[in-house]
Each structure stands twice: as C-alpha cells, then as structure tokens.
C-alpha cells in the first residue's frame, strides 16, 4: 500500500500504532497518528496530519494511506455516514484506504451499523480483511484486495513477509464454510456467529450495569469495557492470577 517515503494515518489507539510491537516500523513504514480521542478517524483530524506532514515537501514523511478498524479498539461501530465521510476525505487526497476487519462481522451485524454493508466497504476500500479468529474460527483472516492495481504485487509481498503457509488451504476452508449459503436460504454462519456474539455481549453489558458497573463507553458490538474501582481491580486480578 505504501512507498518507502510514505506513512499511514490512523487514530492514536489504532491497532497498528499500539498493539503490533512496531511491526509497521519494522517494515520500513511510518505510522502517523491523529489526535482523535474516540477511536474513529475523522476527516478533520486527518486533515491536520496531512497539512503538517506535507508542509515541508520532500523533507517529511508523506501520507499514503489511512487505516481504520471496524469495530474500533474500544468497540465503536462505523455507520455508513461516518465511513463515507472519511473515505471521501481520503479519495480527495488520493490516499489508499485500509480497513482492519478483525471484528468486521460484529460491526456489520450491530444495530449501530446504520446501513454500512460488506459490499459498500469493498467498493470504497483499497484493501481490507475479514476477521476469522474473532468470529469463531481457529485461526486466520481473509485478505481482500479490492483495488485492481494492488493485486499483482500482493502474492509477492505475502511470500516475502512469511504470510504464505504450506497448508494455507486449511484457512480458506474455514471461510468457505462460514460464508456458505444455507440450504434454507437463511443467513450465512459468518453473520449468525457475529449476531450471537453481539447479543451475548449486550446481555453481559446489561447485567454488569445492573450490578453497578459503569460502561467505559457505549458500545453496540461484542466489545464491552467497564470502569472499575481500585478495590474491584485488585479483586479481579486475584481471581485471574
């Protein structure tokens, strides 16, 4: 997605900025975080990064792509309007769009999705992936290269970065099964699992609220976070340890 001199714009809590052990830097690329505080990459914050990074021309890392995730790191769900707004901004700056879809099934089956669909994501993103391990599978994600210009190079990048498995078909079988159309014409297993996970998470949230726990933020996905006191934290740690 990026040339050597380019970087990727993301939120401060974006997975590639926090939880990938410097993997992007190890590949010779730069992460350019915004000042967004809610996990959603906004056009306004992305524009500030763009203006700063392009203010000195060739002397600074130039943005070449944006990174978003659905759901976000804290369980936020992208709806159609918010998604189109950041994609419109990226298109206006000729930037590639990558969506981290580790929890895409949860996001798209959430009541907060607001009309966003997998087909629409495929039309707007340069590349994205379909989460497997966070939706009932043993391992793996399915990378979708939507931009035709990127497809020819991807197999070589996959091999170079040790992403080609000798028995890789075993990963594909999971997705083939998960997306198979049921004989009764119902919803594919991939989406059934996500809806079930969301429903269970919302039941858990309601139960935690009844017990007096305060949600860290509102979330209609299978990610639920709560604020706890120091004493409660110690009690949880004692059980976990």
Describe each PLM feature range.
Residues 1-241:
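Conserved PLP-enzyme active-site core in the AAT-like
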